[in-house]
Amino acid sequence: MKTFTAKPESVKRDWYVVDADGKTLGRLATELARRLRGKHKAEYTPHVDTGDYIIVLNAEKVAVTGNKRTDKVYYRHTGYVGGIKQATFEEMIARNPERVIEIAVKGMLPKGPLGRAMFRKLKVYAGTEHTHAAQQPQVLDI
């Protein structure tokens, strides 16, 4: 019997909505990355994007343990000499709460074109409203 390989055109992708309210950031991001890759499906193939679309709501209410709210630091670089910028978790949540979940999940996905395609299926919103009602997403309890 030959090994089954999923074809990109035959993959069925579902839409799921996840509420991040009170969820621990790392544990939530791990499960989101797993589902974006498609590892929860029997037809998972490493070189094919078999994952689902995921909508994350209430990104500003995501939880972190310990002192990470004040001690966890995110770094970025402007591209100019001496242009390193830093922001704590608290500042990131205040300024752009969606970005915190996006950074956590993106680091858990493959690097390269396939990983970027998987990351594009993640939709993160700060509040409880989203613009994907037409896709009829199912509620996913993580």
From Swiss-Prot:
InterPro entries: Ribosomal_uL13 (IPR005822), Ribosomal_uL13_bac-type (IPR005823), Ribosomal_uL13_CS (IPR023563), Ribosomal_uL13_sf (IPR036899). One of its GO terms (molecular function) is mRNA binding. Keywords: Ribonucleoprotein, Ribosomal protein. Coiled coil: none annotated. Gene3D superfamilies: Ribosomal protein L13 (3.90.1180.10). Pfam families: Ribosomal_L13 (PF00572). HAMAP family: Ribosomal_uL13. Belongs to the universal ribosomal protein uL13 family. This protein is one of the early assembly proteins of the 50S ribosomal subunit, although it is not seen to bind rRNA by itself. It is important during the early stages of 50S assembly. This is Large ribosomal subunit protein uL13. The lineage of its organism: Bacteria, Pseudomonadati, Pseudomonadota, Gammaproteobacteria, Enterobacterales.
